[in-house]
């Protein structure tokens, strides 16, 4: 996965799995998994 940020939260982006934080500031769009 690729590190990304969803607002003030950190997360991970996996190609083809854009869920969890739509509209977040991440790689190619959104974070797939928000880590906290």
UniProtKB/Swiss-Prot annotation:
It is found in: Secreted; Nematocyst. GO terms for cellular component: extracellular region; nematocyst. Disulfide bonds join 6-31. One of its GO terms (molecular function) is ion channel inhibitor activity. InterPro entries: BDS_K_chnl_tox (IPR012414), Myo_ane_neurotoxin_sf (IPR023355). Keywords: Disulfide bond, Ion channel impairing toxin, Nematocyst, Secreted, Toxin. It comes from the Eukaryota. The keyword Secreted applies. Belongs to the sea anemone type 3 (BDS) potassium channel toxin family. This is Toxin Bcg III 29.21. It comes from Bunodosoma cangicum. The lineage of its organism: Eukaryota, Metazoa, Cnidaria, Anthozoa, Hexacorallia.
